[in-house]
Amino acid sequence: MSRATPFSAVINGLTPFFASRQVICGSGRVGIGQSGDEAGFQLSQRADYIEVEVGLETTLKRGIINTRDEPHADADKYRRLHVIIGDANLAEMSTYLKVGTTALVLDLIEAGVHLTDLQLARPVTAVHHISHDPTLRATVALADGRELTGLALQRIYLDRVDKFMSAEGNDDPRVADLLEKWAMVLDLLERDPMECAHLLDWPAKLRLLEGFRNREGLNWSAPRLHLVDLQYSDVRLDKGLYNRLVARGSMERLVSEQAVLDAVDTPPTDTRAYFRGECLRKFGADIAAASWDSVIFDLGGDSLVRIPTLEPLRGSKAHVGKLLESVETAKELVDELTN
């Protein structure tokens, strides 16, 4: 994100958002507390491991906002926003809204929209409190004394993003789709979280667990429930419970399986990933290394040649497509780029 944005604005704007977005993108967890010894089900796998509001660490004293700043881009222009509070998701709607709504909120913050009125009185406690209540009725205290649910906080963010995009005249269909799905999911969650069991991870997992508990006559302290919890996320097609739900049409997908397979080897065309991917495809034998911020060529000389890719939105097909089509060898490409 832009380094010109004050980091205090990032903290103020994102802390309540991250604390509340787990109602949408939590992946569900059996057990309460870091050790999981207390019986119960909660929204998020990571919530109980968040211990401070802001911090650098990722394996202890984890923060809602992480300060690790390695942008893998032009450090004078860009700051890295290292998000460690989010769960890993399998449900496509959870992932779509997790990433998409965060991007929209960042647009607000970078534009200077003030969100200080949403500051939480006790942010870390709020993260835990929201996660521990799958009924979504738990309220958390704001610094100004108001008490709001996680759903209510998400609705405020949705409303402000919607108004901002309208004021800016933003007619991007991707933004419109995100806003529509964000609102739809919040409506369903407010009516009955189980109405999202075909869309989001934590309701899908909870539905499976409740069915298993009822069939086997188990309470939430039963060790077998932890096994079901883990098996939900098993990525093996024949073992993972999520994959079984997909196979029988019980989870709504947003992309086709073919689109997923295509994305394994076909980079997006509108970022530097296009340049990196096409270089690997055409000149893989001549590339010593490739990363976010450079492609390093080995042309057989005394030294390697590093081509920096410090601008995330340069190196797109529009920017370098014709150049890549016009050259036959890696040396020709490097000569064109360096001369």
Curated annotation (Swiss-Prot):
Pfam families assigned to the protein according to its UniProt record, in alphabetical order: Pup_ligase (PF03136)
UniProt-listed GO biological process terms: modification-dependent protein catabolic process; proteasomal protein catabolic process; protein pupylation
S-S bridge residues: none
GO molecular function: ATP binding; hydrolase activity, acting on carbon-nitrogen (but not peptide) bonds, in linear amides; peptidase activity
Family statement: Belongs to the Pup ligase/Pup deamidase family. Pup deamidase subfamily.
Name of the featured protein: Pup deamidase homolog
Species whose genome carries this gene: Rhodococcus erythropolis
